């Protein structure tokens, strides 16, 4: 199972959580690769925000990333209780994948970063589920079973919820993820693997079984057809019957006419109706 951690981070808080989640995945016996979604803000704006340069050792996520990997963990900083524009742009470019159902059945989890309590630790994840739902991607929450003691700790103010790991960054980004928050993120990585492997292995097993059944059915049909043809030929040879030449000519002529008509009909049916150019991936959602 190939796991990708796809995240966006302005000041590095989400990236720190991503690395903790990656460690949790490794502790569960799997490997996860970290990616970052493309930046949409101009450098001039980023400079005014005093945002550090993006890590050069973390590759950019593309549609190919989504098709090549089997399961995903998304690191999402909040913007007014939902994902930032960078993630909306990222998902907005996946219309082709949506049309083909390329991501259907691929499990996903989410972890977040907000400025403080009430800043969207839960709503950011819930709003992010819109993307997963439209693509048919099963959502795997952190829950409580794997990290209850950590999540319910009252020793310090901390991020995270049953929806996923989280951190508080403060309004100016000065607060860094605490040891407790990083431990919860690790637990999410471990818990995600336990559930995702069941879904991915089950999906692959189903696909393999379906393919095998189709092949077996095809082989059986071919064998039956061949046997029937052989029996028919043997029967004809044994009785020594043959059709009159005139009847053969008439049958041949009739077959040619039917073939010609059939070809014309298929040609007519296969002619494509005029198509309206799709302006954006969202137009499909509006129409449907």
Swiss-Prot record:
Subcellular location(s) of the protein: Cell membrane
E.C. number: 1.6.5.2
Major localization class: membrane
Keyword Membrane (UniProt): yes
Topological type in the membrane: Peripheral membrane protein
Phenotype on disruption: Increases the sensitivity to the oxidative stress agent H(2)O(2). Quadruple mutant lacking all four FLPs (PST1, PST2, PST3 and YCP4) is more sensitive to benzoquinone and linolenic acid, a polyunsaturated fatty acid that can auto-oxidize and promote lipid peroxidation. The quadruple mutant is also avirulent in a mouse model of systemic candidiasis.
InterPro entries referenced in this protein's UniProt entry, alphabetically: Flavodoxin/NO_synth, Flavoprotein-like_sf, Flavoprotein_WrbA-like, FMN_Rdtase-like_dom
UniProt KW keywords: Cell membrane, Flavoprotein, FMN, Membrane, NAD, Nucleotide-binding, Oxidoreductase, Virulence
Compositionally biased spans, kind Polar residues: 261-288
Annotated positions binding FMN: 9-13, 110-164
Requisite cofactors: FMN
Region Disordered, annotated ranges: 202-288
Pfam families, alphabetized: FMN_red
Taxonomy, superkingdom: Eukaryota
GO process annotations (BP): cellular response to oxidative stress; positive regulation of ferroptosis
Role summary: Flavodoxin-like protein (FLP) that plays a role in cell wall integrity, oxidative stress protection and virulence. FLPs act as NAD(P)H quinone oxidoreductases. Reduces ubiquinone (coenzyme Q), enabling it to serve as an antioxidant in the membrane.
Protein name: NAD(P)H quinone oxidoreductase YCP4
Lineage: Eukaryota, Fungi, Dikarya, Ascomycota, Saccharomycotina
């Amino acid at each position: 199972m190939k796991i990708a951690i796809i995240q966006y981070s302005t000041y590095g808080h989400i990236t720190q959580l991503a690395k903790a989640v990656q460690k949790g995945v490794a502790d569960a016996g799997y490997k996860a690769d970290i990616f970052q979604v493309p930046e949409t803000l101009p450098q001039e704006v980023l400079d005014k925000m005093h945002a550090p340069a993006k890590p050069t050792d973390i590759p950019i996520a593309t549609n190919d990333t989504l098709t090549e990997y089997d399961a995903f963990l998304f690191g999402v900083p909040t913007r007014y209780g939902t994902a930032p524009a960078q993630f909306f742009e990222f998902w907005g470019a996946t219309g082709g994948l949506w049309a083909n159902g390329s991501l259907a059945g691929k499990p996903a989890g989410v972890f977040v970063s907000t400025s403080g309590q009430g800043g969207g630790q839960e709503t950011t994840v819930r709003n992010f589920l819109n993307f997963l739902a439209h693509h048919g991607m099963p959502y795997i929450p952190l829950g409580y079973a794997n990290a209850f003691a950590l999540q319910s700790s009252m020793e310090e103010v901390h991020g995270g919820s049953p929806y996923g790991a989280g951190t508080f960054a403060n309004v100016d980004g000065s607060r860094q993820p605490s040891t407790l928050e990083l431990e919860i993120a690790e637990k999410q990585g471990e818990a995600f693997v336990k559930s995702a492997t069941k879904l991915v292995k089950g999906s692959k097993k189903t696909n393999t079984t379906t393919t095998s059944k189709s092949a077996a059915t095809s082989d059986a049909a071919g064998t039956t057809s061949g046997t029937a043809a052989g029996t028919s030929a043997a029967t004809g040879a044994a009785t020594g019957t043959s059709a009159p030449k005139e009847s053969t000519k008439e049958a041949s002529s009739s077959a040619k006419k039917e073939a010609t008509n059939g070809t014309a009909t298929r040609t007519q049916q296969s002619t494509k109706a005029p198509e309206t150019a799709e302006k954006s991936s969202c137009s499909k959602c509006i129409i449907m």
